[in-house]
Amino acid sequence: RGLFKCEAGIACILGTGSNSCFYNGKIIVKNVRAGGYILGDEGSGAVLGKHFLSDVLKGLAPKEVMADFFEKFRISPNEVMESVYNRPFPNRFLSTISYFLADYTSDDYVYELIITNLRNFFTRNVCQYDYKNYPIRFVGSLAYSYAPILREVAGDFGIELDVIEETP
């Protein structure tokens, strides 16, 4: 309702997690199950952080970006594993990585990581609705932080986004 008032459309949330629904102007009539950060949450900060950290731990991310990550977070690979597997709220920890990556969008590796994450959201979530016939609007910290890239990915699907808000 916050994004559409009395208008029908597809509402999408991209933050720590992700979700989407079709709102008919009065109520939510369809929802694609989010799946959480382990089984879904495509496009979210947690999934972006998960893929980046996986690449960091395997030495696949660019050396400069990895070095900056370890310096800024003051964390070792073992502490990364501890934060993900043994501490509370690993999804929140993973999501904090997305804010770090926002400073590196000019790096081809980071840019492709973001693009892939957002494309997966559109493919696995948005495309399950009648998306060509309704407006699609986004809310959430990740959607807002990556708005230019989000608009680019939406354009690849023939979608023009008119609203991207940080908070509802």
PLM regions: where:
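Phosphate-binding/catalytic loop of phosphoryl-transfer enzymes
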Residues: 1-66
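ATP-binding/phosphotransfer module of carbohydrate and carboxylate kinases, centering on a glycine-rich
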Residues: 3-4, 8-10, 53-168
